[in-house]
């Protein structure tokens, strides 16, 4: 048995002086010596031939320092200097990269008494707005190295040092190494490095340039292990790029009849592990020799069965699901089978801890805008303006207010830059803050024109430009129109004359009447002030609402409807509500649903849908652009969904390609997320009441959004689990318990969604009188008794799906349509299960075909006995 300790405890040894190595391509490497001066300085570390540069171009705060000479002698040069952060609570490095790229991130901390205090600080490090870990050093002369594998969600990465009240944060070096995007796959979260080991008598560790990704491999050896090696080259041409020095050595148990066992313990008992194992047969076997073994963990839980390593070719095995343990302790066993004449072996082992990043990043365009505003007006001295502008909420930038919609990115809704000595013109970057309600640029030295883009910021209600004596107060026509319609308040200086542009002419107007006008709208300002106070106090309880919505702002007249639809020229579809037309509103495509005068859905349902969509916003709910309530003319104007509804796409009515299994799984999880938001993210919660495939719409990328909320009902907030109501919905999708009792609950939606899931996987009608079992629920249940899932899956899929995932989703659907609502899962549980199905399909597509040729295997589905289910 071999106990594996966190290799990061030993990584600091990788920074001691070693023999020089040959340089290789460092394409994509970012290697920062933190505190190196001057800012354009670079050098090549002679022991690794890695080129380091100053960090000054990646951060605009902090002080530079140097560790004491007594600690430098045996350390590599990038640890000799530090950057410390005595000012501000959070200080951040900024990297412009590419979204969805995968990086190995390494941060090094060597205190070395750089400040002469001999007091080791404690602080946190964040990745974006989420905490990575706490930095704790064992002593003045000791260092720490942290590693993470992270997939970028935006084109920008921020790494932040955060105070915890226990000293001043600092950092010695920061390194980013690009990885292949089809490696280190996870269901969710990032990976914190725990161990990366190889098995050889020498050397003690391996890194660049033997490892082209500059991963640090620490030698693991001791009692119970025997090292074997080869001088022959091993084929390492799989995406993990295992170094030859790792591939050409391996360990076997000293006692050939005993298993190999590796133990490790995570400090948090709730943490999960991902394990990546690298195998190659590096001994020349005799004709009657067999090396075959099983891999299990924690007392027999199967990981992989009957493994035979490829001869002189590396295979990388990993599980698409993380390993878990009730107490944080893990034991990985390699045991030879009864057929094997040779003991198990392993060449390299990587262990990671899962880190779920809980904080959502602010909208990428708004982050870019704020960073550009900061640069334009030289606001680097604003100590709070570090990292993500809105997240986490406790580090929101000074002068900003943000909205925090549930399950969606934070958005900036007010910006106050009053009295900040701003000079120059008003930057167009402000126009990118599309959710802005209030803007205060007063008491600065701004000049130039009042920009017309203010008129296009539809949610903007208040602009304060007073106290900017150099600003030309000519008001553009487009802004004047908004002032006249009272949809915008503009405050200018009380001591200057403003120019109002009327009918193409400039006219000087004394400021006294303007001041009177401002006084006339003072009550509106008071209302706005109360609004912001209430919003701040109730931000958490109203995560599902958007405080920027002003109802009449979304109201559209009937002549405007005629114009946007070109007199109802193009029909998109027809339904019980009426006809849906294609339209264009300000160069944006929209769908216009006109209420038929003979429609069964009356004004009450129309009003209910408008009120719901005006306050509910989620990426998987169809957004309301506006509505028309003009006499007898009622219309809803939605965002345009280019690929129509799910039922059309399943039936082939729209033509085009058959929806793949991958498409279907993603559509299912996105629709489920929208429904789960209605149940758990809204205040009060909502029940949709009409979930069906025609109410799941698909955009141009086949992203799914839930639509048609005319039958939706509020859910009690006083602890009651249901309401009594008249039965409404669509036959076939209607919860039989609700139909029988008139008691409506969230589980009624769950039932309907279960029917949708069965449609997605079978492509069969919900009811079919030609079947012995007319309803799809009964038909699927009867077919499954034969134990052959292929007989119920859509034949158009041509067998191109993950069988294990198919079983999982069918069983989930049948649980949803259980006749008893108490035995149905919640939508939160449904979302979790569907995400696992998506992960299985992703692993299959990125795995089985590629892995067969590239030499690595996703072993979560490799045991035929475990992942080819028969009758259940």
From Swiss-Prot:
It is a single-pass type I membrane protein. LRR repeats lie at residues 411-434, 435-457, 459-482. GO terms for cellular component: membrane. The active site is at residue 690. It is an enzyme of class 2 (transferase). SMART domains: S_TKc. The modification Phosphothreonine is found at residues 557, 725, 730. Disulfide bonds: none annotated. The chain crosses the membrane at residues 514-534. InterPro entries: Kinase-like_dom_sf (IPR011009), Leu-rich_rpt (IPR001611), LRR_dom_sf (IPR032675), Malectin-like_Carb-bd_dom (IPR024788), Prot_kinase_dom (IPR000719), Protein_kinase_ATP_BS (IPR017441), Ser-Thr/Tyr_kinase_cat_dom (IPR001245), Ser/Thr_kinase_AS (IPR008271). This is Probable LRR receptor-like serine/threonine-protein kinase At1g51880.
């Amino acid at each position: 048995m071999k106990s594996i300790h966190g290799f990061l405890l030993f990584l600091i040894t990788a920074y001691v002086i070693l023999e020089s190595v040959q340089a290789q391509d460092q394409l994509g490497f970012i290697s920062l010596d933190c505190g190196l001066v001057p800012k354009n300085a670079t050098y090549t570390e002679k022991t690794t031939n890695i080129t380091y540069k100053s960090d000054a171009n990646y951060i605009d705060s902090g002080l530079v320092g140097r560790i004491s000479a007594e600690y430098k002698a045996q350390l590599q040069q990038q640890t000799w200097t530090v950057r410390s952060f005595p000012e501000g609570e959070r200080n951040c490095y900024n990297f412009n990269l590419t979204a969805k790229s995968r990086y190995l991130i390494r941060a090094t901390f060597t205190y070395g008494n750089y400040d002469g205090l001999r007091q080791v600080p404690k602080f946190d490090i964040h990745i974006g707005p989420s905490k990575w870990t706490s930095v704790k050093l064992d002593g003045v002369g000791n260092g720490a190295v942290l590693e993470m594998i992270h997939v970028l969600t935006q084109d920008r990465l921020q790494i932040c040092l955060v105070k915890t009240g226990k000293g001043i944060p600092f950092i010695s070096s920061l390194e980013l190494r690009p990885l292949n995007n089809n490696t280190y796959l996870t269901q969710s979260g990032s990976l914190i490095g725990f161990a990366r080991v190889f098995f050889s008598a020498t050397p003690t560790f391996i890194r660049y340039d033997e490892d082209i990704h500059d991963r640090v491999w620490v030698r693991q050896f001791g009692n119970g292990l025997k090292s074997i090696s080869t001088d022959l080259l091993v084929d390492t041409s799989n995406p993990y790029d295992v170094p030859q020095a790792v591939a050409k050595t391996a360990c076997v148990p000293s006692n050939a009849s005993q298993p190999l066992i590796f133990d490790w313990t995570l400090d948090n008992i709730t943490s999960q592990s991902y394990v990546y194992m690298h195998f190659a047969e590096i001994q020349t076997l005799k004709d009657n020799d067999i090396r075959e073994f099983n891999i299990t963990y924690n007392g027999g839980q199967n990981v992989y069965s009957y493994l035979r390593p490829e001869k002189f070719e590396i295979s990388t095995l990993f599980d698409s699901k993380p390993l878990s343990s009730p107490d944080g302790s893990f034991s990985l066993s390699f045991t030879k089978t009864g057929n094997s004449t040779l003991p198990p072996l392993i060449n390299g082992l990587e262990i990671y801890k899962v880190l779920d990043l809980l904080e959502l990043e602010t909208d990428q365009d708004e982050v870019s805008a704020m960073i550009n505003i900061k640069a334009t007006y030289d606001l680097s001295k604003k100590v709070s303006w570090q990292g993500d502008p809105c997240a986490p909420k406790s580090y929101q930038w000074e002068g900003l207010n943000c909205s925090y919609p549930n399950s969606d990115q934070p958005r900036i809704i007010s910006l106050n830059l009053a009295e900040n000595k701003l000079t120059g013109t008003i930057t167009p970057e402000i126009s990118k803050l599309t959710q802005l309600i209030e803007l205060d640029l007063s008491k600065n030295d701004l000049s130039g024109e009042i920009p017309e883009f203010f008129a296009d910021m539809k949610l903007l209600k208040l602009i304060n430009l007073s106290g900017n004596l150099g600003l030309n107060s000519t008001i553009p026509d487009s802004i004047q129109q908004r002032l006249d319609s009272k949809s915008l308040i503009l405050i200018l200086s009380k001591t200057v004359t403003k120019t109002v542009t009327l009918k193409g002419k400039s006219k000087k107007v004394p400021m006294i009447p303007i001041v009177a006008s401002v006084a006339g709208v003072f009550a509106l300002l008071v209302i706005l002030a109360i609004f912001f106070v209430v919003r701040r106090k109730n931000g958490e309880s109203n995560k599902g609402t958007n405080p920027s919505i002003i109802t009449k702002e979304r109201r559209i007249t009937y002549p405007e409807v005629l114009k946007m639809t070109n007199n109802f020229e193009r029909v998109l579809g027809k339904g019980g509500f009426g006809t849906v037309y294609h339209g264009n509103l300000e160069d944006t495509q929209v769908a216009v649903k006109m209420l038929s005068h003979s429609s069964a859905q009356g004004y009450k349902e129309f009003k209910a849908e408008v009120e719901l969509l005006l306050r509910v916003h989620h990426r998987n709910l169809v957004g309301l652009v506006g509505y028309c309530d003009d006499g007898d003319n009622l219309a809803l104007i939605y965002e345009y969904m280019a690929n129509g509804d799910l039922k059309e796409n399943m039936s082939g009515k729209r033509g085009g390609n058959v929806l793949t299994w991958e498409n279907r799984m993603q559509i299912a999880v996105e629709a489920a997320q929208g429904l789960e938001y209605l149940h758990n993210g809204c205040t009060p919660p909502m029940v949709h009441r009409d979930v069906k495939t025609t109410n799941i719409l698909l955009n141009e990328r086949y992203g799914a959004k839930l639509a048609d909320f005319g039958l939706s009902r509020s859910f009690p907030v006083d602890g009651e689990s249901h309401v009594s109501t008249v039965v409404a919905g669509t036959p076939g999708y209607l919860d039989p318990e609700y139909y029988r009792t008139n008691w409506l609950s969230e589980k009624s939606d769950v039932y309907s969604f279960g029917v949708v899931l069965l449609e997605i996987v079978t492509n069969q009608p919900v009811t079919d009188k030609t079947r012995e079992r007319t309803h799809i629920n009964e038909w699927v249940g009867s077919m499954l008794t034969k134990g052959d899932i292929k007989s119920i899956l859509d034949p158009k899929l041509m067998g191109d799906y993950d069988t294990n995932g198919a079983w999982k989703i069918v069983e989930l659907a049948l649980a949803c349509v259980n006749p008893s609502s108490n035995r149905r899962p919640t939508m939160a549980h449904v979302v979790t299960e569907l995400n696992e199905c998506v992960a299985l399909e992703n692993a299959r597509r990125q795995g089985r075909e590629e892995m067969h040729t590239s030499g690595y295997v996703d072993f979560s589905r490799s045991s035929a006995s475990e992942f080819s289910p028969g009758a259940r």
